[in-house]
């Protein structure tokens, strides 16, 4: 486990590699408020979501846009969201993702992220996805809001 701040640094490095590969065919905006930076997340949990947004969302576009941001839901959970303006996730895949079923023939990264989160934190956490109004998709992770100090205390038991 690492802080969200550290995870975002890893995402920045991953995006630098993708910028070499894709040039200026997409832009990625990271918009995570300071109050979430010290939350603890599983290491490399966001990379598959960003990779999925690039490969399935904007790789075939000349004007791709990806946004990653964090929110707190009404129950106090951390929501990490990755949105793109691509062609969107097919409805049958959305249905399987949102019911936490394995998706045959692809989306292995999303399945793995969902399983890691659900095994680590329980059934109230995990991955969900939905279409964006203007096109594209948004994939959301729901995690407990644990600060680095809280997590360290919890693992000393």
Describe the function of each predicted region.
Residues 137-146:
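Short C-terminal beta-strand
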């Amino acid at each position: 486990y690492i802080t969200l701040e550290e995870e975002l640094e890893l995402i920045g490095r991953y995006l630098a590699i993708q910028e070499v590969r894709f040039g200026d065919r997409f832009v990625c905006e990271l918009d995570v408020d300071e109050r979430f930076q010290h939350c603890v997340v599983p290491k490399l949990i966001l990379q598959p979501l960003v990779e999925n947004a690039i490969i399935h969302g904007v790789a075939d576009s000349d004007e791709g846009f990806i946004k990653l941001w964090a929110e707190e839901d009404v129950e106090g959970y951390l929501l990490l969201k990755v949105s793109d303006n691509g062609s969107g996730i097919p409805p049958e895949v959305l249905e399987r993702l949102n019911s936490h079923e394995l998706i045959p023939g692809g989306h292995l990264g999303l399945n793995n992220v969902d399983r890691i989160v659900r095994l680590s934190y329980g059934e109230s956490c995990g991955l969900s996805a939905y279409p964006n109004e203007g096109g594209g998709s948004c994939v959301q992770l729901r995690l407990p809001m644990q600060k680095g100090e809280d997590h360290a205390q919890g693992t000393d038991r």
